[in-house]
Design a protein with these regions (language model features):
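PLP-dependent aminotransferase class I/II
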Residues: 41-116
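Proteins with a high burden of low-complexity, intrinsically disordered sequence enriched in S/T/G/P/A and R
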Residues: 1-2, 18, 112-117
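Active-site pre-lysine segment of PLP-dependent enzymes
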Residues: 1-9, 19-49
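Residue-level detector of anion-binding/catalytic polar loops
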Residues: 12
Length: 117
């Protein structure tokens, strides 16, 4: 519905997907980005999935917006130390991030189960 609206109007949707990995205990909620990546500016963070101290977020832009972003806001520099970026990249590349998310989901599901008599 949102995707159709954005496509019809040539508009973009800003989707802040903070906490998406744990907002649904049994399955991740489908994002608008997954349906219409060409119409969505997707924003997310690693502070819930890894640790609150991991103050690292990211933004995925539709291809037509990348050059405009770089022209207007390219002067912004990344404030995340390079070492943390490398560690995070390896965490993702190795599959450990996905395993971490799955472990946390299992723990949350276990916690959400009603107590047995």
């Amino acid at each position: 519905e949102y995707a159709a609206w954005a496509r019809e109007r040539g508009a973009y949707i800003i989707e802040d997907d903070y906490d998406s990995e744990f907002s649904a205990l049994f399955a991740p909620i489908e994002t608008v980005f997954s349906v219409a990546p060409e119409r969505v500016i997707y924003i997310n963070s690693f502070s819930k999935t890894i640790a609150p101290a991991m103050r690292t977020g990211y933004m995925v832009l539709p291809a037509p917006l990348v050059a405009r972003f770089e022209a207007r806001l390219g002067f912004y520099s990344c404030t995340v130390p390079v070492y943390e970026q490398y560690v995070l990249a390896e965490f993702i590349r190795s599959g450990e991030l996905e395993r971490c998310i799955n472990r946390r989901r299992r723990a949350l599901r276990q916690k959400a189960k009603p107590p047995r008599d």
